[in-house]
Curated annotation (Swiss-Prot):
Transmembrane segments: none annotated. It comes from Vibrio parahaemolyticus serotype O3:K6 (strain RIMD 2210633). PANTHER family: UPF0260 PROTEIN YCGN. InterPro entries: Puta_zinc/iron-chelating_dom (IPR005358), UCP006173 (IPR008228). It comes from the Bacteria. It holds the Pfam family CxxCxxCC. This is UPF0260 protein VP2169. Belongs to the UPF0260 family.
C-alpha cells in the first residue's frame, strides 16, 4: 500500500487536485474573524459569510467566491508561512506545522460524515451578519471566557 500523498509530499509539491482535496469542508474559514488592535490576536466568531450554506458547510457560489464581493481568502502555496490564522484543525495549517491530519478528516474516512459527527464543522452552529448586533457577543475563542 502506498503512502498517502499528504504524508509523502510537502504542501509546495502537491498537485492542484491534491491541494484542493486537503480542504475538509468544515466551513470554519468562512466564519468572520475579529482582530485585537493592540495584540493582533485573531478571534473567531460564529458569524458566517453570507454565502455559506450552514447545513452543507459549503459556499453557495463556490466557483465565484473570490469575485463575489465577499472577503473570501484564497489559500496559496505562497502563503504557507501565514497559515497560523487558520483553525487548529485545518489540514493546510496542520501539514504546514508538520502535524498529522485528524482521524475524522475526509481524506482518511472517505466522507464528511465523521467530521460532522465529531462536531468539527460549523453545521447548524452559525448566525449570519444580518442578524448580528454586537459582534463581540459572537466571539468563540474569547480569552476571558471559559
Amino acid at each position: 500500500m502506498s503512502t498517502p500523498f499528504w504524508q509523502s509530499k510537502s504542501l509546495e509539491h502537491m498537485s492542484e487536485e491534491e491541494w484542493e482535496s486537503l480542504c475538509d469542508g468544515c466551513g470554519k474559514c468562512c466564519l468572520h474573524k475579529l482582530m485585537d488592535e493592540d495584540t493582533d490576536e485573531i478571534y473567531y466568531t460564529n458569524v458566517a459569510c453570507s454565502w455559506l450554506n450552514s447545513k452543507t458547510c459549503s459556499c453557495k457560489d463556490y466557483p465565484n467566491r473570490f469575485t463575489s464581493g465577499e472577503e473570501c481568502t484564497k489559500l496559496t502555496r505562497e502563503d504557507i508561512d501565514d497559515f497560523t490564522w487558520l483553525p487548529h484543525t485545518c489540514a493546510y495549517r496542520l501539514l504546514a506545522e508538520n502535524q498529522p491530519l485528524p482521524e475524522w478528516h475526509p481524506l482518511i474516512t472517505g466522507s464528511k460524515s465523521a467530521m460532522h459527527a465529531a462536531g468539527e464543522s460549523v453545521r447548524n452552529k452559525v448566525v449570519y451578519e444580518i442578524d448580528v448586533v454586537d459582534w463581540e457577543d459572537h466571539i468563540l475563542n474569547h480569552p476571558n471566557r471559559p
